[in-house]
Amino acid sequence: PLLGTWRQVAAERRDARLARAEAQRNRWAPSELERTELRRLARVRRAGLAAVLLAVVALDVVLFGPWQGVLADGGRVVGGALLPAPGTLGDVWGSATSGWVRDGLGTSAPADPFLVPLAGLTALVGGGLQTAVNALVLVALPLAALAGWFTAGALTRSVGVRAVAALVWAASPGFLASLASGRLGATVVHLVLPWVLLAALRAVGVHARDVVDLPEVHRGLPDGGRARAATRRRGSLGAAGAAGLLLAVAVCAAPVLLPVAVVVLVPAALLARRAWRTLLVVLVPAVVVPLPYWGQVVGSWADGGWRLLVAEPGAPVVEQGAPSGLELLLGLPGGTAWFGLDDADGALGTLGRVGPAVGGALVLLLAAAALVRRRAVRGVRLAWFGA
């Protein structure tokens, strides 16, 4: 017979469970020396991020500084594919959900899915749609640098590598070309995709972290090993949900990304083994949010509805010429100079013309070198497949 009540037994088990959890925390808790070193690394990391942001913001002020007065007086950022965007949050949300396209005499058809993220952006800035578009164009460069910095941090803790990744992503020729031509959809995709990758990596438990290697033996480890060797990070369903919502934003801006995401995430789910369900969850919002649009694409496929997959928001832009194979390999959209410096004189013009090609070649060489590394070779090959 039991010598205690069921309540006493439950309390005893609870105390034992809490004691085991406390012992586990004490076993892996960093020492005072480790905490000091981690704080130093955090200061270095913050200084690196501040330097990157300072450089990018200074460049942003140089490029868009003359616009500030015009925009403050009610001006608009227009040109290329970017059209005037009048309307309030209610107008944008009504157009996104009404199922009625107002162009011409009007017709019953699903709205452009890009209106959904635009409605969220309009609500975020607290003004009209034109204010949201102006703000997005003006802060696109710092946002791209932030995206590159934090996404690189999921794979490495090196401040130098993260700084280079942030600057390369912010100075990408394709991104600058989309800004110059007013392709708002391509701009949003460039800003969102790194966060999709970061959230997807967190979803499967891949995230680099600072680990301090001290000469002393870590307490509580019978074999004298390091805590890093025995620690296994779990995936996060919340991160998978965030990746799905961010991917939905990217797909709304460029619908052609949905088949690309399927081609990338399905093999990744097969390789992930334990986290395959988590990766498949990432695809759900991208399918559900623009669902009426997919119905229109499938229903009119034989009549040319497939063109809706490659459609871009905004006015059509006529390109001067198609890029060559070498330009595509280097990530150049054809005849792209850094920040429009191709007409400048002297070293500045040379830098503007040669810089994009040199940057693309450097990224290509680093990516090729990563293929021969033994560590994380599966992830590198998967990234090449996705690219």
Predicted regions and their residues:
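Start-transfer (signal-anchor) and selected internal transmembrane alpha helices
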Residues: 27-66
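Periplasmic/ER-lumenal interhelical loops and adjacent helix-loop junctions
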Residues: 36-37, 80, 87, 91-101, ...
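Transmembrane alpha-helix segments characteristic
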Residues: 57, 363, 374-387
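Active-site lumenal/periplasmic loops and adjacent helix-entry segments of GT-C-fold
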Residues: 65-194, 199, 208-217, 223-229
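Transmembrane alpha-helical segments
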Residues: 144-151, 192-208, 245-246, 263-270, ...
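Transmembrane helix irregularities
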Residues: 171, 248-257, 288-292
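Short hydrophobic alpha-helices at membrane interfaces in multi-pass membrane enzymes
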Residues: 206-248, 277
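Perimembrane helix-loop-helix junctions
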Residues: 219-226, 259-287
